[in-house]
Every structure is written in structure tokens, then in C-alpha cells.
């Protein structure tokens, strides 16, 4: 059984993330979306909320699970008995960083491969950070996030502004 782990912050999940999850689900027997708990970062959504939002988006896939983790990614991958780390690449800059991380993970666990998946061109400019910036200035975000979470995101933005 081929198990892939797709790690990230997903704050919030984007259409680019979902596209990659869908494509990975067609290539692996099981895909685990691993939501990173980063205590040094104040997210828009709590870890539990991010897990729930992603679960809404991937509910139609029988072979996709969503779990949170903290600590080393490679420890989580081993615990889940996965053999592949899935990484999305939007740009050369992404590749440089992810290549270095893949080499580090390979050194820590040479039995685990890293697979790079190139982002679909129509999503290559989308990032969670950019979405948050657009939203903070009342910009329209529905073209950037999965339809399943547009309302959740809009409600959170209103509450963060103190309008709700």
C-alpha cells in the first residue's frame, strides 16, 4: 500500500492545495493531509478548525485523511507508516527550499521518498498568505479557496475585523 503524507499549515486551505490533494489521491492508495501545529505562529484558524475545514473539502475522497502533527515531519511519516512525502511546487523558489528539506528528510529516514508535484498553472500564484492579505483589504477571495469553506473564511475575516 502506497501512503503519501502532504504536510502544510493550510491556514487556510487553497484551491491549489485541494488540486494537489485530488491529484495525489489518484496516485496513492492513501493520502494523509498533515496539518502542522506551529506554536510560534498565530494562525487565522486554530489547528482544530483547519483540520475541520480541510475535512469539509476532502469528504468525497475515501482515501484521504486529515491529521494534525507537531515535531519533526519525518517522525509523523514513520508513525503513520507512510513511504512518501508529497510536496507541491509553485516556483523555483519553492523548489530550492523543498529540495533542501527533502535532502534533510532523506538523511533522517532514507526509506522515505519525497515526491514533488508541480502546481497546476491556474493555481501557481495562490498562497494562503496572499489570500489573507487580499481578505484583509476586503478583496474577493472566493476564486482562491474551495467553495466548501468560502463562508467560513468570510465569517472569520469579519470577526477578526471586529465587524461581527
UniProtKB/Swiss-Prot annotation:
Keywords: ATP-binding, Coenzyme A biosynthesis, Cytoplasm, Magnesium, Nucleotide-binding, Nucleotidyltransferase, Transferase. It is an enzyme of class 2 (transferase). One of its GO terms (biological process) is coenzyme A biosynthetic process. ATP binds at residues 9-10, 17, 88-90, 98, 123-129. Its cofactor is Mg(2+). GO terms for molecular function: ATP binding; pantetheine-phosphate adenylyltransferase activity. Its EC number is 2.7.7.3. Substrate binds at residues 9, 41, 73, 87. The keyword Transcription does not apply. Coiled coil: none annotated. It is found in: Cytoplasm. One of its GO terms (cellular component) is cytoplasm. Pathway: Cofactor biosynthesis; coenzyme A biosynthesis; CoA from (R)-pantothenate: step 4/5. It holds the Pfam family CTP_transf_like. It catalyses: (R)-4'-phosphopantetheine + ATP + H(+) = 3'-dephospho-CoA + diphosphate. The record marks 17 as: Transition state stabilizer. InterPro entries: Cyt_trans-like (IPR004821), PPAT (IPR001980), Rossmann-like_a/b/a_fold (IPR014729). Homohexamer. HAMAP family: PPAT_bact (MF_00151). Reversibly transfers an adenylyl group from ATP to 4'-phosphopantetheine, yielding dephospho-CoA (dPCoA) and pyrophosphate. Belongs to the bacterial CoaD family. PANTHER family: PHOSPHOPANTETHEINE ADENYLYLTRANSFERASE (PTHR21342:SF1). This is Phosphopantetheine adenylyltransferase.
